[in-house]
């Protein structure tokens, strides 16, 4: 074999070996990452269960603020609904643009 063909063959073998080793390494990393998924999930579920048993007081301040805001917004919306129902009672009927009345079915 000529020198050029030997160099080409050696380079091809090195590139092939590097590719095989690289793919094997990536597969091992992915396998380890997939293995960590259920472990992290179990830890997250356990932390959530502990937070529930300890009550709402264990929430961080930003979550407490957001929860309080949502509760106050909900109360405000309930008051607005009562106010508007007194002004215009809800009948459960839907009137189309043709004037046809469609009753809603109870679920």
UniProtKB/Swiss-Prot annotation:
- Give the signal peptide range: none
| One annotated Gene Ontology cellular component of this protein | mitochondrion
**In the UniProt record, does the keyword Mitochondrion occur?**
yes
User: Which keywords does UniProt give here?
Assistant: Mitochondrion, Transit peptide
What biological-process GO terms show up in the record? mitochondrial cytochrome c oxidase assembly
Summarizing the function annotation, the protein's role is: Involved in the assembly of cytochrome c oxidase.
Family, as annotated:
Belongs to the PET117 family.
| Protein name (database record) | Protein PET117, mitochondrial
Q: In the UniProt record, what gene is named as encoding this protein?
A: PET117
